[in-house]
C-alpha cells in the first residue's frame, strides 16, 4: 500500500487493511514522497508499522532512482515461499489517489508505462506487468472509501491533492493547513515568509 509520507494515517485506506486481514496477505507500507515529509515523524511511522504482524514499512522518494528498487527485495522477504516460475510473486500496488502509485511502478519497471499526473484518478483500470519469470506487478486505480470518518483526515487528503477539488472548500482547507503549520512548524513558516513573528 502506497501512502503519502506527509500524512500516513490519513492516506491509509481502511478497505486495504480489511482485504489484507481477510486474505491473510503480507503487507508492505510504502511511505512515498518522503523527501517532502518531516524525517523524524516518518521514522516514527516506520517503527509503528513494523510492529504490525506480517507488515513491513519503507520510506522512499521516487525522485531518487535507487530507492524504489528496494521494494522488490522487501516483497520477497515478506513472501519467501513465492518467487519461482511455478509460484511467481504477485504484487499489487494499492492506495488512495495521487500518492504516486503509477510513478512508483514506472520506477520499479524502469520504464514509462503507467500514465502519471499531479491530480487524482489518472489510472482508470488495473495494469498488469511481468517483471521477470518469477515476479508480477499490478497497478490499480486509486481507491477511496465511502466516507472519511475524521474531518482532520479529509483536510489532509485535500491538502495533498488526494481527493478531487469538487469534494472540499479550498478556503477551509487553507485555514486548517495554516493552523497545523502554525502549531507544528512555526519556525519554518517564519523562514519561508521572512517574518520575525507569526
Place the predicted regions along the sequence by residue.
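Short, well-ordered alpha-helical segments in soluble proteins
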Residues: 75-82, 108-112, 120, 135, ...
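Structural beta-sheet core signal
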Residues: 1, 29-31, 93
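Canonical P-loop GTPase G-domain recognition
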Residues: 25, 34-96, 113
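Helix-rich effector regions associated with P-loop NTPase G domains
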Residues: 6-27, 34, 40, 54-56, ...
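Short, glycine/charged-enriched secondary-structure capping and boundary segments
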Residues: 14-18, 43-46, 72-74, 106-108, ...
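Residue-level signature of catalytic and energy-coupling elements of molecular machines
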Residues: 4, 49, 104, 139-140
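Glycine-rich phosphate-binding P-loop
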Residues: 91-116, 140
Amino acid at each position: 500500500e502506497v501512502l503519502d509520507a506527509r500524512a500516513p494515517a490519513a492516506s491509509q485506506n481502511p478497505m486495504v487493511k480489511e482485504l489484507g486481514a481477510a486474505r491473510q496477505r503480507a503487507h508492505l507500507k510504502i511511505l512515498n514522497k518522503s523527501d517532502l515529509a518531516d524525517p523524524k515523524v516518518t521514522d516514527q511511522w516506520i517503527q509503528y508499522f513494523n510492529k504490525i504482524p506480517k507488515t513491513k514499512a519503507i520510506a522512499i522518494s521516487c525522485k531518487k532512482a535507487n530507492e524504489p528498487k528496494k521494494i522488490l527485495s522487501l516483497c520477497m522477504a515478506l513472501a519467501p515461499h513465492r518467487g519461482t516460475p511455478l509460484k511467481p510473486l504477485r504484487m499489487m500496488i494499492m492506495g488512495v489517489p495521487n500518492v504516486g502509485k503509477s510513478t512508483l511502478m514506472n520506477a520499479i519497471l524502469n520504464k514509462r508505462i503507467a500514465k502519471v499526473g499531479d491530480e487524482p484518478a489518472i489510472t482508470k483500470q488495473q495494469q498488469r506487468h511481468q517483471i521477470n519469470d518469477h515476479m508480477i506487478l499490478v497497478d490499480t486505480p486509486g481507491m477511496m472509501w465511502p466516507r472519511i470518518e475524521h474531518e482532520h483526515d479529509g483536510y489532509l487528503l485535500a491538502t495533498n491533492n488526494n481527493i478531487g477539488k469538487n469534494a472540499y472548500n479550498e478556503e477551509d482547507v487553507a485555514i486548517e493547513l495554516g493552523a497545523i503549520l502554525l502549531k507544528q512548524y512555526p519556525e519554518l513558516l517564519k523562514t519561508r515568509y521572512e517574518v520575525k513573528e507569526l
